[in-house]
């Protein structure tokens, strides 16, 4: 995985190493435009309905079980299953998926003033790893944070804010309004054993395909 990342970035020169930052968040940059694109082409959306099962006949998916709202499929329909790995394993018979995961912890802090001309910074020597500033909010990320995720939010906030204040040159500023977000299954554990468990996009069912960073993309999940 590391060699692929290096070939796609460092070995291709500075133009391939320039990070892109979403100005107003990932929803504004990716999700909302995608929804508008699909809506403009007559796509129907059904949100907040958990997929409970796949109806399978003769090696293909013929229906989707949403509980009280089943959906039958036509002969030419294709299903793209973009759900977390454990959910996919519960839906697709015989599907092997990564079963070990790593946590990510994020801290978001309200700044007293906007920091002009600053977007993001890699941190070294502290707890935080990446620092992003958008508007009046500073966000700091810690990956592979399994142990940290078990700590209480107050302790995490204090430690991360110390990194933020130092990196931004804020001095001895009291802990501001903040939010700590823990995602205990943020990525699968990218070990050799778990890498072997990543499935491809194609499945044993003719019209069912998988999507997700936990599939065999050739790249890390983060």
Q: What is each PLM-predicted segment?
A:
Residues 49-181, 200-202:
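Mid-domain catalytic core of redox enzymes
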Residues 129-133, 183-210, 214-217:
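FAD-binding beta-loop-beta segment adjacent to the flavin cofactor pocket
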Residues 42, 88-91, 219-222:
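Short, intrinsically disordered, charge-balanced linker/junction segments flanking boundaries
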Residues 45-47, 81, 210:
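A structural signal for the hydrophobic beta-strands that form the central parallel beta-sheet
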Residues 145-146, 214-222:
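Glycine-rich phosphate/pyrophosphate-binding beta-alpha loops
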Residues 1-57, 75:
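Active-site/ligand-binding neighborhood in enzyme catalytic cores
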Residues 2-7, 135-138, 203-209:
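Short coil-to-beta-strand
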Residues 44, 174-177, 207:
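Conserved beta-strand segments of alpha/beta enzyme cores
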């Amino acid at each position: 995985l590391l060699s692929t990342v290096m070939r796609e970035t460092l070995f291709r020169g500075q133009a391939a190493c320039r990070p892109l930052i979403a100005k107003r968040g990932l929803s504004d940059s990716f999700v909302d435009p995608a929804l508008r694109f699909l809506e403009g082409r007559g796509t129907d959306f059904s949100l907040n309905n958990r997929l409970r099962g796949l109806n399978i006949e003769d090696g293909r998916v013929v229906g989707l079980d949403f509980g009280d709202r089943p959906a039958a499929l036509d002969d030419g329909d294709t299903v793209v299953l973009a759900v977390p790995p454990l959910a996919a394993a519960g839906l697709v018979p015989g599907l092997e998926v990564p079963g070990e995961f790593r946590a990510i912890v994020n801290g978001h802090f309200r700044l007293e003033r906007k920091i002009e001309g600053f977007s993001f910074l890699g941190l070294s020597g502290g707890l935080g790893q990446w620092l992003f500033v958008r508007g009046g909010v500073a966000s700091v990320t810690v990956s592979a944070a399994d142990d940290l995720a078990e700590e209480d939010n107050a302790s995490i906030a204090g430690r991360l804010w110390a990194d933020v204040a130092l990196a931004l040159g804020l001095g001895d500023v009291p802990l501001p309004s903040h939010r700590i977000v823990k995602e205990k299954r943020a990525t699968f554990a990218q070990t050799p054993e778990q890498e072997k468990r990543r499935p491809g996009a194609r499945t044993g069912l003719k019209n069912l395909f998988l999507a997700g960073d936990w599939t065999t993309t050739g790249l890390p999940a983060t």
